[in-house]
Amino acid sequence: HAMNPILSFLLWLGAHTVPANHLTDEGLRIKPSDNLPMLRALGRDPLIIKSSRTDTIYGLTELMGAALNSAPNLDRPTLVLGAANDELVPSEAHQSLLRLLETEHNAVTYPNGWHMLLRDLQAKIVWRDILSWIRNRHAPLPSGDGREPKNSK
């Protein structure tokens, strides 16, 4: 796991003692995006989940850990997108993923990106990079943020 061990333990404890307890982001002061109008709209949307059960959050973090541990088994070219301002996915977790990947991969960390890369104010830059990579994964990305492919075989 790339998660803080104390937080991991507290989440495990909560999931196993008060699994139906609902948690919100209230008081966390986490900024998931620089697109404030979009965040406000999500906050008003009645279909957006505004609290999650403790066991659900624990399950999500376990799934993320399993995905990270499975990274060496990924056998397809991969575009890995990261955000320099991501306050939800720790930089260490992103770097661990890149170290574990054994397949050919392109890694991009957007200096002005946030957790919600595809909804951030610079989303169009990310969209163009994704479309370009889908069309030709060996071509430079339009943003210029891409690095040379890693582990090319």
What are these regions (language model features)?
Residues 74, 80-82, 86:
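Short beta-strand/loop motif that positions the catalytic acidic residue
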Residues 49-50, 85-89, 116:
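Acidic catalytic loop of the alpha/beta-hydrolase fold
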Residues 104-153:
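Catalytic active-site module of serine/aspartate enzymes centered on a nucleophile-bearing elbow/loop
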Residues 2-6, 90-93, 122-123:
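Residues at alpha-helix caps and immediate loop-helix transition turns in enzyme cores, especially N-
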Residues 52-70:
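Active-site nucleophile elbow and catalytic-triad environment of alpha/beta-hydrolase enzymes
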Residues 1-53:
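Alpha/beta-hydrolase-fold enzymes
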Residues 76, 90-100:
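Short alpha-helix in the alpha/beta-hydrolase fold that links the catalytic acid
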